[in-house]
Amino acid sequence: MTFPSHNPPETGHPSAAPDEALPAAEAPVPGDPEARFSSRSIRSFVLRQGRMSVAQQRHLDETLPKVGIPYRVAPLDLDAAFGRAAPKIVEIGFGMGETTAKIAAALPDKDFLTIEVHGPGVGSLCKLIAEGVLDNVRIVQHDAVEVLRDMIPERALAGVHVFFPDPWHKKRHHKRRIIQPDFVALIASRLAPGAYLHCATDWEEYAQWMLEVLAAEPALENTADGYAPRPAYRPLTKFENRGLKLGHGVWDLVFRRRG
């Protein structure tokens, strides 16, 4: 099976496709730098030459060794990784980490295994972890599909978050979307019975795509009649607030693993 991969660093808006013109600061890194984070040929993340701040680099150097978990092809002992037994939630593609840090701070009784490839975003979340003294967040800087496939045991998770993934809005790029039948089946296999998968997007056509794909997965059931109200634990992003004021929509989908 082939899976597309997870979202690029900027969440909440469509990203430019790889073949579109981009500003110099956002141009794709020459060569194939994504190969460091994924062995798969179809990926939905594209590494950009983003600017790394001094603070982000410092926390990559100082904080990531404390909270980072290297990718490996071996099951991860999740309780050992966090030093306790607690519900484990995977967050796929956390952007710059603001939402992740807020959720983790609000839910200290849960542990969050977060996955992102973008260096400045990883550095930003590391900074927020250090500033907030968040003991319940760990980071894997790698392709989310490979992390779930190779490191997460079956029925081990209490939840999975996929917030504002790249919609890859051009039809020829739909194969790069992270929400695909095979990947949803993989996620479902990692959820414990009764655990949830929560997706959110501000791209209406992608919301419809997500709803169709999730509804077709036999191991999952919708918790709502179509789209779900935004759960209280998911804070509004700055981009989302601006969009709502302009009348733009945001769609949440919350599905539960059948027993």
Curated annotation (Swiss-Prot):
GO terms for cellular component: tRNA methyltransferase complex. The active site is at D166. Substrate binds at K170, D202, T237, K238, F239, E240. It catalyses: guanosine(46) in tRNA + S-adenosyl-L-methionine = N(7)-methylguanosine(46) in tRNA + S-adenosyl-L-homocysteine. Its EC number is 2.1.1.33. Pathway: tRNA modification; N(7)-methylguanine-tRNA biosynthesis. Pfam families: Methyltransf_4. Residues 14-29 have a biased composition (Low complexity). It is an enzyme of class 2 (transferase). NCBIfam families: tRNA (guanosine(46)-N7)-methyltransferase TrmB. HAMAP family: tRNA_methyltr_TrmB. Belongs to the class I-like SAM-binding methyltransferase superfamily. TrmB family. This is tRNA (guanine-N(7)-)-methyltransferase. It comes from Aromatoleum aromaticum (strain DSM 19018 / LMG 30748 / EbN1). The lineage of its organism: Bacteria, Pseudomonadati, Pseudomonadota, Betaproteobacteria, Rhodocyclales. The gene is trmB.
